[in-house]
Amino acid sequence: TTLMSRFTNAYGEALVTDHPLLTRLAATADRVASATISSIAAIGIPKARAATIHTLATLVASGEVRIEPAVDVRVLTRQLLEVPGIGPWTAEYIVMRAVHWPDAFPASDLVLRRNAGNLTPSELVRAAEKWRPWRAYAAMHLWRR
């Protein structure tokens, strides 16, 4: 996305390759933690969201929070939910994408709910029980419908 491009340009490390579109690495937690909330907001991120990003980057950079495949997802989810500005959808999305947890399922997602038959989040959670422990794959399928 455009916003992700601006974020990567601002905080990602420069990369020299033969490919003209590969010019930066993803931003590291250390680099984002060393930025100010105002500078993060200046690239077009709402200030409250910039504060959330900064707080999470600081926790990851310090080692207090580990976002990696070997973590206990229950512990990580609890830690994520303690960060102001991170709710259940974001926590589930992080464990799905960054930790590769196959049972993550952001049941409050509007597209998932619509594509599953306009279910409420609690109805979708109940319906998704039969997809355990592979609910993230079901989410990917529903997002593509």
Spans of features found by a protein language model:
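HhH-family (HhH-GPD) DNA N-glycosylase catalytic core used in base-excision repair
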Residues: 1-145
